[in-house]
Amino acid sequence: MTTLLISDLHLHTGQPDITRGFLDYLERDARHADTLYLLGDIFEAWIGDDYLGDLERQVIEALRRLSDAGTQLYFMHGNRDFLVGEDFAAAAGATLLDDPCLATLGRQTVLLMHGDSLCTGDEEYMKFRAMARDPEWQAQILALPIEQRLELAKSLRMQSSDANTQKADAIMDVTPAEVEAIMREHGVSTLIHGHTHRPAVHEFTLDGQPAQRIVLGDWRPGRGWEVRVEDDAPPRLREFAFQARA
């Protein structure tokens, strides 16, 4: 049994090589997997299931082919694609996950997260996150005309980029105390997340027992990241190359 976990592709029309690499990944690697977890920020922006451009349609169709072929698909919202809804999930053949979420990988129960909720030192972002995950706020946004939502998404991305250039690196990384607290709350020794774009395996001690935090990397032209779990083997973080094509 093979399980794959990926995040932070940030798919958009300006990076067609990454989109092509992802579509190839679905046909090549994921087709041989039993389960694929998409842990957020698969899309750079998502303004609602009622707006589908060519890129979005391509991805949905590829995911549907994968799910129809027998691979179980799970989708967790990120800080960029938090408006992905049930219509997307139904079209893609995926199941939407809560964040955080417990999952059994091999013989081990692990905690899955996108990772943005762990960055509690970034108080400005945490305020935005609380607002953006509010169902009432989301309903108000989804009620806006598509053109207005496109402009809002563009504005939010620019604001985020400008703000991040002025923040210290430590603020945008996870808060260790928050990591320990949520792992303790869910009774796990392994946490897998993305968001920070800092791929690594962090080994530490939690309440006297060995623990680990596996951080997925973001995809870039020609390079991707995954966590792969084969049968009962422990999760393995892996960087891989793909052919970048326009």
Swiss-Prot record:
Binding site for substrate: 79-80, 122, 160, 164, 167, 195
One of the Pfam families matching this protein, by short name: Metallophos
EC code: 3.6.1.54
Superkingdom of origin organism: Bacteria
Catalyzed reactions per annotation: UDP-2-N,3-O-bis[(3R)-3-hydroxytetradecanoyl]-alpha-D-glucosamine + H2O = 2-N,3-O-bis[(3R)-3-hydroxytetradecanoyl]-alpha-D-glucosaminyl 1-phosphate + UMP + 2 H(+)
Chain sites annotated for binding Mn(2+) 2: 41, 79, 114, 195
Gene3D superfamilies: 3.60.21.10
Keywords: Cell inner membrane, Cell membrane, Hydrolase, Lipid A biosynthesis, Lipid biosynthesis, Lipid metabolism, Manganese, Membrane, Metal-binding
Cofactor remark: Binds 2 Mn(2+) ions per subunit in a binuclear metal center.
GO biological process, one term: lipid A biosynthetic process
Chain positions recorded as Mn(2+) 1 binding sites: 8, 10, 41, 197
Principal localisation: membrane
An MF annotation (GO) of this entry: UDP-2,3-diacylglucosamine hydrolase activity
Subcellular localization, as worded in the UniProt entry: Cell inner membrane
Cofactor(s), names only, from the UniProt record: Mn(2+)
Pathway as given in its UniProt record: Glycolipid biosynthesis; lipid IV(A) biosynthesis; lipid IV(A) from (3R)-3-hydroxytetradecanoyl-[acyl-carrier-protein] and UDP-N-acetyl-alpha-D-glucosamine: step 4/6
Function description: Hydrolyzes the pyrophosphate bond of UDP-2,3-diacylglucosamine to yield 2,3-diacylglucosamine 1-phosphate (lipid X) and UMP by catalyzing the attack of water at the alpha-P atom. Involved in the biosynthesis of lipid A, a phosphorylated glycolipid that anchors the lipopolysaccharide to the outer membrane of the cell.
Family: Belongs to the LpxH family.
NCBIfam families the UniProt entry points to: lipid_A_lpxH, PRK05340.1
Record's protein name: UDP-2,3-diacylglucosamine hydrolase
Gene that encodes it: lpxH
